[in-house]
Amino acid sequence: MFFVTPAYAEEAPAAATGTDAHAAPAAGEVHTETGVAEGGHARGPFPPFDSTTYASQLLWLVITFGVFYLLMQKVIAPRIGAILDQRHTRLSQDVEEAGRLKAEADAAVRTYEGELAAARAKSNAIGSAARDAAKAKAEQDRRAVEATLSEKIKAAEVRIGEIKAKAFADVGAIAEETAAAVIDQLIGGTVAKADVAAAVAAAKKEV
């Protein structure tokens, strides 16, 4: 930014006047030179480096910085602060929501695990009761079958004893008759029936 001071403003017309004096020759004069006069542009230092303009430059610098500072303080900084506060509030809400959802998920997991453990315990109890009932029923059926078989075995043993006794009785009579016939054929005589019965009885005892 360039600043025009009164000193530079006074020098500018003088330079312009000097230029006009060179540009407008008197009547009747003929100039054959084609060079450009630069004396007017060489007067004075470059405005930003002119020591006479330092005060005004510092003043405008302070004014510009003050305006920029007020703009930052009144407009930009509040907007940035509001955005940061909004983001902080949003993050806090998101963190709270995440914590709430995590707590609900943990509670749901604990409830599920509790229900699963209860279901397993109930299933084990039902299985154990079913096994015990089946075992008791099987034991009862086994005992009933054993009792029935025992009764049948006893009845069969009695029947076998009766058949055996009858068979032995019949065998004894047949043996006596057969022995009498054999003796009669061998020695050609008869033997007393009591002797034959005694011999058969002795043979039965040996068997």
UniProtKB/Swiss-Prot annotation:
Function of this protein? F(1)F(0) ATP synthase produces ATP from ADP in the presence of a proton or sodium gradient. F-type ATPases consist of two structural domains, F(1) containing the extramembraneous catalytic core and F(0) containing the membrane proton channel, linked together by a central stalk and a peripheral stalk. During catalysis, ATP synthesis in the catalytic domain of F(1) is coupled via a rotary mechanism of the central stalk subunits to proton translocation. Component of the F(0) channel, it forms part of the peripheral stalk, linking F(1) to F(0). The b'-subunit is a diverged and duplicated form of b found in plants and photosynthetic bacteria.
State the HAMAP family in the record.
Answer: ATP_synth_b_bprime
Origin: domain of life: Bacteria
Where does it primarily localize?
membrane
Q: Which family does it belong to?
A: Belongs to the ATPase B chain family.
What's one Pfam family the UniProt record gives for this protein?
ATP-synt_B
Subunit info? F-type ATPases have 2 components, F(1) - the catalytic core - and F(0) - the membrane proton channel. F(1) has five subunits: alpha(3), beta(3), gamma(1), delta(1), epsilon(1). F(0) has three main subunits: a(1), b(2) and c(10-14). The alpha and beta chains form an alternating ring which encloses part of the gamma chain. F(1) is attached to F(0) by a central stalk formed by the gamma and epsilon chains, while a peripheral stalk is formed by the delta and b chains.
Gene encoding this polypeptide? Answer: atpF2
The membrane topology term of the UniProt record is: Single-pass membrane protein
A single Gene Ontology MF term assigned here is: proton-transporting ATP synthase activity, rotational mechanism
List membrane-spanning regions: 58-78
**Which of UniProt's keywords are assigned here?**
ATP synthesis, Cell inner membrane, Cell membrane, CF(0), Hydrogen ion transport, Ion transport, Membrane, Transmembrane, Transmembrane helix, Transport
List cellular component terms (GO): plasma membrane; proton-transporting ATP synthase complex
State where the protein is found.
Answer: Cell inner membrane
Q: Can you name the source organism? A: Rhizobium johnstonii (strain DSM 114642 / LMG 32736 / 3841)
Q: What is this protein called?
A: ATP synthase subunit b 2
